[in-house]
């Protein structure tokens, strides 16, 4: 592969064995970037360093990280809402604020963003963000729009090698061991993968995952060690070790 791409990669098939694998590799001397984000423009100035952007929910193509909240076993939200979305200025992410007021009240702390969104397809998602001393329409501002950047749609895509990429900026969900684990890059419960010499960064929750078979016991551990052990036992019973 050469150059940069903003699109996620979904491998359609796997290799036949460890000696007959499919390899995804960046071309020698090329910097190939795969992102889960898109550049956004059209920011409107609100006050001081605060800017606002409104987008139709259709922009997100069925998955809206600013309506998607982080939750699951072993996650403590500390009394606030966390989203899988993110806002990036020149490649670096801002911090999600606890409320619109937290963004409107400028401070010397890390720049914040905040979003409001409804679930309807015809609705609007509005983002507010602090860009200290910067016009976001003259800089590169990106937002998360995809849950992963390299992840099979189905399990059993075996014997892949992924090498030499920059993979970044994905709206990954919380990944407890008791639920399906979707990473910025992940095998989706497939075997024989080699992931090497890649830069993996700016993932909301997790970078690399093995995955998990989905079943009726997802997120039902009640935060117990026994729940974790039973997750492993069920995987072995389903033939993972064969």
Predicted feature descriptions by range:
Residues 1-189, 194, 199-201, 207-210, ...:
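Extracellular polysaccharide-degrading/modifying enzymes targeting complex plant/algal/animal polysaccharides
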